[in-house]
Amino acid sequence: MTGFSPLGWCGLALLALAGCGAPATPVPAPAAKPPAPIDQLNRIVEAYWDEHKPTEHAISPQFLADSLSIERRYLTQLTGVPRDQLDASSRLTYDIFGRRLEIAVEGFTFPDELLPIDPFDGMPQQLAARSEQLAHDAAAAPAAYDEWLRGIDDYVRWTQQAIANMRQGIRRGYTSPRTVVERMLPILERLGVDDSANPFYAPLRSMPDSIKAAERARLTKDLTSAIADKLLPANRALHDFLQKEYLPRARAGLALSGLPLGSQWYAYRIKRTIGTPLSADDINRIGVAEVERLGSPPAHEATPAPANGLVNAYRDLEVPVQAALPALFSELPKSSFEIRGAEWLPQPATALYYEPGGPNGVPPAIVYVIAGKGARPLSIAGFLQAGLPGRHLQIALQQERADLPRFRRFGAEAAFTDGWGLYAVSLGEALGLYPDESSKSDAAAAEMRCAVALVVDTGLHAKGWTRGQAFDYLRTHLGVDDPDAQSLIDWYATNPAEAMACMMGGMKFRALRAHAQQLLGGRFDLREFHHEILKDGAMPLDILEAKMKAWMDASK
């Protein structure tokens, strides 16, 4: 029994005595009962989330030092939880949390903060995406706009710290590749222009009618001032620094192994991405074997760009996809996503970019269609990969699981999510969504892109490949044009090992399904398999494998 004051206990326990005066000899209070292991674990993971939310863009020395201290402290606390006394669900939490802490602590060995520029998914683009999300949130309250204002202040501090870090990187021999910096410049130039088309002004164009006139006037004034006087100058300052001071000192090579501790750094990034201690040589061999297995898909002319526009074509495609999903999934996310164009994003070879939404779909998730300069065909496989039943389905279901600890509900695991996206492409035929040879060829090409990434990524970062070698390999096995090939090479250079997540994760999902079908035979139910895969959220692949094998054994 808890929650009683000493006086209360006196009234209950000593009622039969002559009075409630203090006893002659003090009686020591009973020792507090230690929390049950499950409660102990839950307290630890929730306290961690409250103390150290995933603000991965904070790159100041003080923040990094504090973060390392926090990660170590919680890792020590976790070792005090008796894992063998936990139930199956809590053991998953224990294992996932422990792995993430270990990976995080090891990561502080390497100075990622000295290379903050990413022309594909960098802080400026993420801030622009948040602005677009707020603009399309029909239920946004004034508090959401005030939070956006605070986000602008945080971003300005980030740009200042990024410049300071890059100057330190120059002194220490850590700089980004020249081509990566060159690719970042037009993005910052576009996001630094003071005109109404700038995505940062989007929230001003569509405030919900529910916001009262006085609040609307205040927010409009404050946002206009913050954007014009803080945010846009910060982007211009970052642009000018990159162009005038950093670009002349940027490195000519692409390989992470060309930097101090580069080989160890790359090995760590492989482990962080795929969750297993495979070497670059191991990954390269797997990639070569997969490229050979897939061979050259039959050549088919791509479907021409739709007359009603690419964005509208993807919106139209969502209707039959939604209708087909219940055949393979017993649970679908409640939150939807929006499909929009994004001229301010760089042109990647995939042409679709997924931005997760907030809890319960507020703000909404977005699939961005990046048409680029030339006309692009509709890609059914790309939509399945980025939207449904791919990344959106997996991430939205995870976010809607209110029973999961918050670090799992809102955390990320690249090999799981990207691998699920590739696995989703393989479901297109069963869903009846590949009506012709062109769409089937497009699906095969999506798998080949992920296989090729294993070879090119390891080639660039561990095997001394030149840009020309990477270009030739991409042209030979993907048939992509020059801009797409160059874009892919710069993406691999910017994000070493991240491209491995797609193929390594996709292979794991296919292997688990094949094993389940073989083991369960006629009892195998694909809807149940998908439910079991997704219901606990993203996790490292080896932990997923152990979980699924336990499910298979219980289902026999």
Protein language model regions, located:
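Bacterial N-terminal signal peptides
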Residues: 8-19
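N-terminal maturation segment of proteins
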Residues: 20-556
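N-terminal secretory signal peptides that target proteins for export/translocation
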Residues: 1-4
